[in-house]
Structure formats: structure tokens, C-alpha cells
């Protein structure tokens, strides 16, 4: 094995030719050319939790500093879906599965028009994906969308801290970031009502106009796959902004109302709760995730923050 090649290439038994040219590596194995683009422009960076715990890794994507809630996700697959899920808006996500990016990217499985995570924290970032549908490197996707990512870090150690102490604030910063400014970051209040940052801005329709059922979707941060599933079940959809009025929903005359998933604290959605109350007895209502909690509050229930957040 050519000594300039490592990581994924160590899987191969022998090399016919190995060379390095500029910022690209090329390896000829058994008549096939495998290429990768070096993770150029990377630098050391830190995740600092509010309890003072520090984890060192390497930065890729955007190099801007991040202050956010740090949560973990234990999924073995679906890293692209997590990154683009509006439910993670305003949060930095720690992926516990050790290898991320191994099947590349595929636009058809994204859950929103763009990434919503404020930061992404992974163990090993694969730059040699294996997937016949792959459309590009995950590292390039992070760069393209300006998402700060910390890799080469022990994500399971981070998760143990969060498991023992609960979800907490954290900052992602470059190694050259001024120490005095880190304290200023921790003093910042995290944004509230993330729903209004991710909801659609206008009413719209999608699906087969001749479908048997018509469903009004209250978009608190709805995932694309939920919309696709409703369409596949024979529904045409009218998607409303999170702050839509009940009279506008009823004017569309849907067969039922769907309250979607979304990010943040449901107690910030008093405006949505009041409108849902006005739908009682008029249309069937179904809620999922955030929508479920909005519906519970409309019926007089209360909600509280869980220790671990998303898992």
C-alpha cells in the first residue's frame, strides 16, 4: 500500500499504482480508479460544554463559532435526514454511530430544503462513500451549506456526559478562538420559538388534486417524508404556516387536520394552541411530535422538557 494512502484505502489488498497530485489523490486498483478529495482547509477545533468539559477534534464545513443546545442521536443510518430535519433547528447533534458519510448524499432523502442543525459532531467522517445512488461527499455537502462540523472526536464519550448530566449548552469553536470570547458565547440566550424560523411562509397545495382525501397540514417544521407518506396514502395536502388562523383552515374545507412535528419548546406556541382549540368539534385532528404536544396543550395538558432531548 502506498504510504500516502490511508483510511478507506487500507481495505484494499494491493496497489498497482499510487500517486498524489495537488489536492487530489488517485489510486489504481485492479483496473479501477478510486479518487478522493483531501479534507483541505480543516483545522483543530473544540466542543466545550457548559459544565467545562472539552473535546478536541477537527473542523470541517463552516469555521464560524456555534452556541447551541447539544443533543445526541443514536441512529445507525440517516445522518442526512437528521441534518435536514427541521425538528433539530437550533441544535448541534452528536451522532453516536462511529462512521458518518459512508453512503454519501442523496437529495431525494433529505427532510427539508436545507440543513437545519446548527452544528454536527461525528466520530469518523468518511470521504470514500459506497452507494450506487450517491450524489456527493457528505463533507462537501457540509461545506456547501455552511454547517460547522467537528469530527475525529469521541462522540460516545460526549454522549456519556450528556446521559449523566442531561442536555446542555455547548460551543463549537476553532482552536484559535479567543478564550475570553468563549465566556461571552455561553452568556448568550438561545433563541426561542424555532417553529417560526422553519415553517412555510405561505399557504400551498401539493399532491394529486383528484385524491380521495384532503388534509390540512399545520407546518410546525414538517418533515418531507411525512408529506410524502400522506400523499402515498391517497391524500392531497394544503400546507399552512404555523401561525395560520383556524378560519383559514376551515375555509379550505379539509377532511381532517394534521399537526406536524417541529423544533423547540411547545410552550412557545401559544398562538398555535389557541387556533387548534377553535378546530375542536369541526374537523378530525391528528398530531405527531410537536403537533401532539400542541394538541395536548389545547386540551389543557402541560408539557415539560426531557433530560435527553432527541435520541
Give names to the regions the model predicted.
Residues 256, 261-311:
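Cysteine-nucleophile active-site neighborhood
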Residues 1-4, 22:
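Targeting/processing segments of secretory and organellar proteins
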Residues 5, 10-13, 35:
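Short hydrophobic targeting helices and cationic amphipathic motifs
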Amino acid at each position: 500500500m502506498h504510504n500516502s494512502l490511508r483510511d478507506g484505502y487500507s481495505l484494499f489488498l494491493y496497489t498497482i499504482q499510487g500517486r498524489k497530485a495537488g489536492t487530489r489523490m488517485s489510486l489504481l486498483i485492479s483496473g479501477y480508479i478510486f479518487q478522493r478529495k483531501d479534507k483541505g482547509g480543516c483545522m483543530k477545533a473544540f466542543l466545550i460544554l457548559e459544565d467545562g468539559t472539552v473535546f478536541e477534534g477537527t473542523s470541517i464545513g463552516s469555521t464560524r463559532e456555534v452556541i447551541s443546545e447539544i443533543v445526541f442521536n443514536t441512529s445507525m443510518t440517516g445522518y442526512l435526514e437528521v441534518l435536514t430535519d427541521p425538528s433539530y433547528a437550533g441544535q448541534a447533534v452528536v451522532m453516536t454511530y462511529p462512521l458518518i458519510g459512508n453512503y454519501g448524499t442523496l437529495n431525494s432523502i433529505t427532510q427539508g430544503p436545507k440543513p437545519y442543525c446548527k452544528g454536527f459532531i461525528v466520530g469518523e467522517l468518511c470521504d470514500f462513500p459506497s452507494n450506487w445512488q450517491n450524489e456527493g461527499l457528505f463533507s462537501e455537502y457540509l461545506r456547501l451549506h455552511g454547517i460547522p462540523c467537528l469530527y475525529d472526536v469521541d462522540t460516545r464519550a460526549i454522549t456519556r456526559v450528556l446521559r449523566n448530566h442531561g442536555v446542555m449548552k455547548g460551543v463549537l469553536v476553532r482552536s484559535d478562538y479567543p478564550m475570553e470570547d468563549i465566556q461571552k458565547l455561553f452568556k448568550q440566550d438561545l433563541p426561542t420559538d424555532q417553529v417560526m424560523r422553519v415553517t412555510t411562509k405561505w399557504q400551498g397545495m401539493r399532491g394529486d388534486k383528484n385524491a380521495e382525501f384532503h388534509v390540512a397540514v399545520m407546518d410546525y417544521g414538517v418533515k418531507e417524508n411525512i408529506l410524502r407518506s400522506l400523499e402515498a396514502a391517497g391524500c392531497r395536502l394544503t400546507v399552512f404556516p404555523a401561525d395560520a388562523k383556524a378560519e383559514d383552515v376551515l375555509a379550505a374545507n379539509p377532511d381532517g387536520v394534521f399537526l406536524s412535528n417541529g423544533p423547540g419548546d411547545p410552550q412557545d406556541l401559544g398562538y398555535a394552541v389557541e387556533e387548534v382549540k377553535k378546530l375542536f368539534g369541526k374537523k378530525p385532528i391528528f398530531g405527531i411530535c410537536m403537533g401532539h404536544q400542541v394538541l395536548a396543550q389545547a386540551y389543557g395538558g402541560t408539557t415539560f422538557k426531557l433530560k435527553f432531548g432527541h435520541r
